[in-house]
Design a protein with these regions (language model features):
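N-terminal secretory signal peptides that target proteins for export/translocation
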Residues: 1-15
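Residue-level hotspots at or immediately adjacent to binding/recognition sites across diverse folds
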Residues: 43-330
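C-terminal motif of bacterial Sec signal peptides marking the signal peptidase cleavage site
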Residues: 28-31
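Sec-dependent signal peptide recognition
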Residues: 16-23
């Protein structure tokens, strides 16, 4: 009898377990029945070519607002912060945009507070025109953007490293290594050609002409950005060129400066302390050139030169480091 009672109890427990399992399965089934995947009505948009936010903040210590008259960029020279060198800066569409090494770009509304992004190739030059920013750099890469924040990329034929770009008269003109000069009307479709074999370092527009400068004292001019006439103006390297106050001004190594009213006939002069001048611009009633000078202690000093006529210059130093680009405050 005891055995029989135990058997009945065991059988009863088995039945209860089976019932519990059945109820559990029904609950799971009903829960699954109620789930419906959410399908968005929005179309799937492929990722765009947007700069990536850096994992570590990019230093903008190499960006200087000088007397609220000029934005000057260079190496950041800050230990343990980063190695971002800012190479060029421009203004357009209500903001300043600067580009540099270490895959970086930065944007500012007021020229004081900057937002930096990464995800680019190294960029050497930038300009604004025809409603867009154009930045150029290594590998023949050209970046274009409406707002300086979201960028798209094209590559010029030959993939030659580009160093500078300007816009005027309905055309972008970019210059680079090995004699390459490229032009575009929209910033996205480019034609490249060779003008000589040296590296072109800078380009600007003024008085109806594009003017480009190169290593080994070369200066070239063009009325259309396509057909160029080159000549020698001195023997040192020219790094920067600008137009303002009805005059072209060219700057380079050993303190050399050249100026011209027409971009064809040039007069040369020299700044006495023989700096290396990397860039020049004109705005707010003066020319400003920036670069570096070697210090007896064995390092470079950031140097600014300013002039009202492009001939007579006054210098100012700004501590240890190098300066590479400049544009007027708007």
């Amino acid at each position: 009898l005891v055995f029989y009672i135990k058997a009945v109890e065991i059988k009863s427990k088995i039945v209860k377990i089976k019932l519990f399992c059945i109820v559990l399965c029904l609950c799971v089934f009903m829960a699954c029945e109620k789930y419906e995947p959410v399908i968005s009505d929005e179309p799937v948009i492929p990722p765009t070519d947007q700069p990536k936010e850096p994992q570590e903040p990019i230093s903008t210590d190499g960006i200087i607002n000088w007397n609220n008259e000029f934005i000057i960029v260079g190496d950041n020279n800050m230990a343990n912060i980063g190695s971002n060198d800012w190479n060029a800066v421009t203004y357009g569409n209500g903001r300043y945009v600067t580009v540099g090494d270490s895959n970086s770009a930065a944007c500012s509304i007021d020229g004081i507070n900057w937002t930096a992004t990464s995800g680019f190739n190294d960029l050497s030059g930038i300009c604004y025109g025809n409603g867009k920013f154009i930045a150029v750099g290594t590998g023949g890469n050209v970046r274009y953007s409406d707002d300086g924040g979201g960028w798209s990329t094209v590559t010029i034929p030959g993939k030659t490293n580009l160093r500078a770009v300007c816009y005027e008269n309905g055309k972008f003109v970019a210059v680079g290594e090995n004699g390459v000069i490229a032009y575009s009307t929209d910033g996205s479709s480019w034609t490249a050609k060779k003008v000589g074999s040296n590296d072109w370092n800078s380009v600007c527009y003024g008085n109806g002409k594009f003017v480009a400068v190169e290593n080994d004292g070369g200066v070239a001019y063009s009325t259309d950005g396509i057909n160029w006439t080159a000549k020698k103006v001195g023997s040192n390297w020219w790094y920067g060129v600008c137009y303002g106050n009805e005059k072209f001004v060219v700057v380079g190594t050993d303190g050399d400066v050249a100026y011209s009213t027409d971009g064809i006939s040039w007069t040369t002069t020299t700044i006495s302390d023989a700096p290396t001048i990397m860039a020049v611009c004109c705005g707010n009633g003066k020319f400003v050139a920036v670069g570096r000078i070697w210090n007896a202690s064995g390092y470079y000093i950031r140097t600014i030169y300013y002039s009202t006529d492009g001939i007579n210059w006054t210098s100012k130093t700004m501590g240890r480091g190098e300066l590479y680009g400049v544009c007027p405050v708007q």
